[in-house]
Amino acid sequence: GPKQHPEKLIPKMIFNIFNNFDLPIYGKGKNSREWIYVKDHCEALLKVFTKGKIGEFYNIGSNKNLNNLQVTKSLLNISKNKIKLGKKVRILFIKDRPGHDIRYALNSNKIKSKLRWFPRTNFEQGIKLTFDWYNKNKAYYKSLSKKDIIKRLGKG
């Protein structure tokens, strides 16, 4: 969602798309994550704070696992309908970071069954909302330096 730390995959790729930079992906892009829209995550936290039991743990997740290559291709597809690119932006596979986790996934059944919380925003909706937010708030990403957004790339 909006204002995620700029070095993370989605804001980094959006920044690069807007600036016609190549899209660097670690390894073969197979590292997968469970994606959840920020508003859904905040609503889950509120549910835990107001309805959860003290001392209990509640994993917050969407059950939507996608790898980095799938997420990047999704952003490229969205960009084709939203902005005019100055040149063809390419996906560029770079050396993976040492110790880079291959998969993050949660079992969020407990929060769903005990607190009746479910994400409202599917991945496709959330990624479009995020792209649109960055497109409408260009001053935000322009205030970030390129160094802040791509500082870890290539430092395997």
Regions found by a protein language model. Name each.
Residues 1-8, 31-32:
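Flexible, glycine-rich beta-alpha linker
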Residues 11-156:
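C-terminal substrate-binding subdomain of Rossmann-fold SDR/epimerase-dehydratase oxidoreductases
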